[in-house]
């Protein structure tokens, strides 16, 4: 990006789950890959875009974390850890940019029927679904509605916040 680049909105949504296994069985290289994509990827995108937002005195950043980052999931320690890191990054960066008209928020969705489920065992997917009181997966339209509001001018106050969209799985 050059100095003339104007960026108003950044949505960080890349993510991988990795193996469905206990922490002590994780291959270190796979662990690093999950952290690199999910957490370091969010960091790198924010680091690249924030200076342009500061220059323009405006911006909206929405980080897609996960309910796993709040609650943790058995046999998903790397994914859960990476998304917990995204939540902490969101809170810190949101506070750093609060006086610059830049809102930084995260959403913590429960499972949705996307290709990420293909990375998980059927048993793990069923275990995830069993934790959701709504007894269904998140519809992508539900998530995009929340993300659109968070990235709009209508959201002029909320920053450094985490918005739950877990069908009742998380209560905080």
What do the predicted segments below correspond to?
Residues 8, 24-43, 58, 62, ...:
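Catalytic Tyr-X3-Lys loop
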Residues 17-20, 71, 148, 159-172:
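Short C-terminal tail/terminal secondary-structure segment
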Residues 21-23, 30-32, 117, 124-128:
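Substrate-binding pocket helix/loop in short-chain dehydrogenase/reductase
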Residues 26, 72-80, 92, 120:
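Active-site loop-to-helix junction immediately N-terminal to the catalytic Tyr of the SDR YXXXK motif
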Residues 46, 82, 90:
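Active-site helix of classical SDR
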Residues 51, 95-99, 156:
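Alpha-helical segment proximal to the catalytic Tyr-Lys
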Residues 66:
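Residue(s) in the substrate-gating loop at a strand-loop-helix junction
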Residues 106, 127-158, 165-167:
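C-terminal helical subdomain
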């Amino acid at each position: 990006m050059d100095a003339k680049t104007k960026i108003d909105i950044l949505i960080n949504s890349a993510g991988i789950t990795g193996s469905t296994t206990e922490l002590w069985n994780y291959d270190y290289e796979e662990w690093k890959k999950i952290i690199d994509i999910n957490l370091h990827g969010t960091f790198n995108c924010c680091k690249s875009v924030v200076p342009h937002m500061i220059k323009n005195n405006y911006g909206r950043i929405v980080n897609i974390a996960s309910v796993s980052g709040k609650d943790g999931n058995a046999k998903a320690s790397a994914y859960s850890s990476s998304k917990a890191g995204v939540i902490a990054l969101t809170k810190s960066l949101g506070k750093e940019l609060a006086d610059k008209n830049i809102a930084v928020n995260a959403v913590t969705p429960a499972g949705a029927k996307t290709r990420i489920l293909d990375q998980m065992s059927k048993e793990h997917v069923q275990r995830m679904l069993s934790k959701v009181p709504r007894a269904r997966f998140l519809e992508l339209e539900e998530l995009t509605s929340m993300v659109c509001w968070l990235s709009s001018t209508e959201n002029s106050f909320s920053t450094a916040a985490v918005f739950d969209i877990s069908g009742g799985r998380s209560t905080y």
